[in-house]
Amino acid sequence: MKKFFQPSLVLTTLVLALGGTNAGAAATVTFTQPEGYVDMPFAPWEKERVMKELKEHFEKLGAKLPQGHDLTVEVLDIDLAGRIEPQLHFSQDIRVLKGRADWPMIVLRYRVESQGKVLASGEARVDDKSYLDHFNRYSANESLRYEKRMLDDWFKTVLNQ
């Protein structure tokens, strides 16, 4: 049996592992008692996907901080945009967005540190009651597009980034 060395695969893996990150900025994200969150999907794999995508988004935001700054986020509660509508004939329920009392909301604690010194910290209830009325740079196919835009706005406003 011959073993083939694929330099393009190795190079691609290395670029993906090292590229796109700010070596000096770090983000740590934790989800405190997610089983008690106001609005999370029912299926365990969907819950994992939501938390993974939010974690990755906070990491992208943390990478925008100046080199040497570290962002710590503790997610305390999540209420996703829209409401779940159970579907009897399909394997997945659907999320319906009406723009009424179904806006996205995330409660979190945050801290930005540099060299052991706390630069900013607090607890925030991040929400967007008019989430359907704003321009959204995330495509219609993007998962959690309203939550991501809302977090982008919070990050720009609170952390001036």
Where are these regions (language model features)?
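A short, structured loop/turn motif at beta-sheet edges
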Residues: 63-71, 111-121
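Classic N-terminal secretory signal peptides
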Residues: 9-18
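Surface-exposed short loop/turn segments
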Residues: 75-113
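Sec/Tat signal peptide C-region and signal peptidase I cleavage site
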Residues: 20-26
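Short secondary-structure boundary motifs at beta->alpha junctions and helix caps
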Residues: 44, 121-151
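N-terminal segment of the mature soluble domain
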Residues: 31-77
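Short, low-complexity, Pro/Ser/Thr/Gly-rich segments in the mature regions of secreted, periplasmic
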Residues: 151-160
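Bacterial N-terminal signal peptides that target proteins for export
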Residues: 1-10
